[in-house]
Amino acid sequence: MKVLIIGGGASGLMAALSAAEEGYAVTLVERQGRVGRKLLATGNGRCNLTNTGADSPRYHGAAPAFVRPALARFGVRRTLEFFRTLGLLTVEEADGKVYPLSDQASSVLDVLRFAVEQRGVRIAGSCDIVEVKKKARGYEAIAATGEKFFGDKLIICCGGCAGKRLGGVKSGYFLLGQLGHRCTALYPCLTQIKTDPTWVKALKGIRADAQLSLRRGGAVLQEEAGEIQFTDFGVSGPVAFALSRAAATGGEGLRLVLDFFRGYGAPELAAFFRARRESFPALPAEELLSGSLQSRLGKTLLKRAGVAAGGTLGAVTDAEIEKLCNLAKHFPLEVLGVMGFDSAQVTAGGMDVSEFRADTLESCLAPGVFAAGEVLDIDGDCGGFNLQWAWSSGYVAGKAGKIEAI
């Protein structure tokens, strides 16, 4: 049987290896000159290839439970065993994140490329597929150059439109659309959040530990804690990335509320700053937060709280301290949106999973067509979850309808 795979990213490479393992004749068509380019950029060049906590609650979309059969069939344990057989050693870090022992994403791509070559997979690079057609037997894919490819089974692994610089495109959505499939709304995900720049411009480049709450009115939509980084347009860092999906899909009227003292209550903070005022009354007022926060961040809080910069600590009133503490615990920023697909790591949304079988990833509309990875309406949390979905779904799709005992 001939298997044709369109897309040479993580899910496409896994699908190729999985299909070749069955003895199928596999052709992998990739739009770019080389396969796996996005892998080299994951995890800041380290490749966070999975997470030991990968399970359906860490995934999103219209039907997150869709991931369960694939994760049960080829989960974290089997993924790590698979990579070990290819010659890759790994190390588990905080929060269940797994990286190659070499600390280099190139190690992951290398072992995949070597395995693909060894198993006889034909790779057609620099080949942009623009059309797929159902034939009397199987499917035909036509490139922009006019070149044609055939497969008894067709697997679409084109990924999403995030990370355009690294090859993110919408081609997978268009190709599956030609076969009758529906695409949901698409949003940039795992990216920076844009806010009103009034108070963040002066903080550009500053890193801080904080709790971030995404809110609409009095309702908290999502809350995360950890390191953030201010930019001239808003907030970045792992915590902002974790909130970006909700910020992208949540519509208007959203705001971020930052807590820079998440280990302390406002009354405790107020008592601490009153004691500092009494101990050092002659110090400039702008030094009130100098032992607690980065200098520019502290001065921004003082300015927003209305504490006069030219005075002394002794002149700061109890009311000003109370206002400052409330602001330090509830620093509001109006959300203007998120950065676009160029900056995003993942696409939220994709092909409607109700039109695919969860156990095989075969199309319910076009028998013999399968889809895997980011092209489907599944996206995971930051921390290796999206790559695990790529491995799991690629493996299952590569079996081309063959169901193994779990």
Model-flagged regions — what are they?
Residues 153-199:
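Glycine-rich loop(s) and the adjacent beta-strand/alpha-helix scaffold that form part
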Residues 124-125, 298-379:
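A glycine-rich dinucleotide-binding beta-alpha-beta segment and adjacent secondary-structure elements
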Residues 2-28, 397-402:
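N-terminal Rossmann-like FAD-binding beta1-loop-alpha1 element of flavoenzymes
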